[in-house]
Swiss-Prot record:
Keywords, in A-Z order: NAD
Binding site for NADP(+): G13, A14, T15, G16, E17, V18, F161, A162, S163, N164
Protein family: Belongs to the NmrA-type oxidoreductase family.
Organism: Gibberella fujikuroi (strain CBS 195.34 / IMI 58289 / NRRL A-6831) (Bakanae and foot rot disease fungus)
Induction, as annotated: Expression is repressed at alkaline ambient pH and highly induced under nitrogen starvation and acidic pH conditions.
Protein name: Nitrogen metabolite regulation-like protein bik4
InterPro entries reported in the protein's UniProt record: Ergot_Alk_Oxidoreductase, NAD(P)-bd_dom_sf, NmrA-like
Domain of life: Eukaryota
Phenotype upon gene inactivation: Leads to decreased production of bikaverin.
Function according to Swiss-Prot or TrEMBL: Nitrogen metabolite regulation-like protein involved in the regulation of the gene cluster that mediates the biosynthesis of bikaverin, a red pigment also considered as a mycotoxin.
Length: 326
């Protein structure tokens, strides 16, 4: 294996489904990986203790809302590059980005969202996204901060998480389990969060920015990631129920709901209203996001970056059934 461009990396969000995959894949690519945690004793449901030990993951105390902790983390680990994600902060992570840069981080990979492409008044202009479309606006603000602070970076603009139907929308409190679908026939591009993490790790450890022949912006690499097939929520749940039956488990009851009911359900889950409304908007307005000329390019990027085909939705469901239905 060739030596990695960055041999020491710092990964935030490693107790989540994407960050955990970033950490493990960065190790597999030859980097020494430190995982930044607010609570270094926190249980990690995505990386087992044996995996953490085998990958020699170093737990370090750091918080993206605490710039001083970031400076200490970089100094203590000697990290040259870091993976970050959007967290709620008054300055849209400008303080965190500045602290990481000033402490010695040379390059950042930011987990963004593909929604930023079409959420603004002008396609592709992240500065034209309004705050009321909160999710893409929040991610766009971090990208803008990275640009204005002149930090070399990659914006990994990921599509619809394949885990959303199971992690967010499945009601496991009812019997039989049920799901309430808003805009069931609208297409989405479900992508395995592990594929997102692996692709992000590839551009974290060996950035395309520094590869010979790179022709993009000098300090910004934009990476769009989509799943291998466009599927409506109806099609997704047909697949989920088929795999449940094959596994000897009861099917999930599928209900169709209005926007008002969708917002009520998210309110019960204590999702902030501004986030809930942005989620509703993103569930309904996807056709521009998956324009053929854009989707055909992004669907191949997982394989391009990782050398492995993107996980099909049915394969993802088979793998995750024990997590959500046992």
């Amino acid at each position: 294996m060739p030596s990695p461009h960055f041999s020491k990396v710092l990964v935030f969000g490693a107790t989540g489904e994407v960050g955990s995959a970033v950490a493990l894949e960065a190790h597999a690519l030859g980097a020494h990986v430190s995982i930044a945690l607010r609570d270094t004793t926190k249980h990690n449901e995505w990386i087992s203790p044996s995996q953490e030990h085998a990958a020699d993951l170093q737990r370090i105390s750091a918080d993206l809302t605490d710039p001083d902790s970031l400076k200490r983390a970089v100094h203590d680990t000697g990290a040259q590059a870091a993976f970050i994600y959007a967290v709620r902060s008054k300055d849209t992570l400008r303080g965190a980005i500045t602290a990481l840069r000033d402490a010695g981080i040379q390059y950042l990979v930011f987990l963004s969202t593909s929604q930023v492409r079409t959420a603004g008044t002008t396609k592709g202009d992240i500065r034209s996204i309004k705050p009321d479309h909160f999710i893409p606006w929040q991610h766009a603000q971090v990208e803008i901060a990275l640009e204005e602070l002149e930090v070399p970076h990659a914006a990994v603009r990921a599509g619809f998480f394949a885990s959303n139907p199971l992690r967010i929308y499945l009601d496991r409190s009812s019997e039989p389990k049920q799901v309430n679908l808003l805009a069931p026939e609208v297409p989405h591009d479900p992508i395995d969060p592990k594929d997102i993490g692996r692709a992000a790790a590839a551009v974290l450890v060996n950035p395309r920015l520094y590869a010979s022949g790179y022709q993009g912006e000098p300090k910004k690499d934009v990476v769009y990631l989509s799943g291998p097939a466009l599927l409506s929520q109806t099609e997704q749940w047909e697949i989920i129920n088929r795999e449940l039956v094959a596994a000897g488990k009861p099917e999930v009851k599928v209900n169709h709901i209005t926007v008002e009911q969708y917002l009520e359900n998210l309110a019960k889950l204590h999702v902030p209203d501004v986030v809930a409304k942005s989620l509703a908007k993103s569930m309904v307005e996807t056709r521009a996001l998956y324009a053929p000329e854009d989707y055909e390019k992004s669907r191949g990027n997982v394989e391009l970056l990782t050398g492995r085909k993107a996980t099909a939705f049915d394969e993802f469901v088979k793998r995750e059934i024990p997590r959500y239905f046992d």
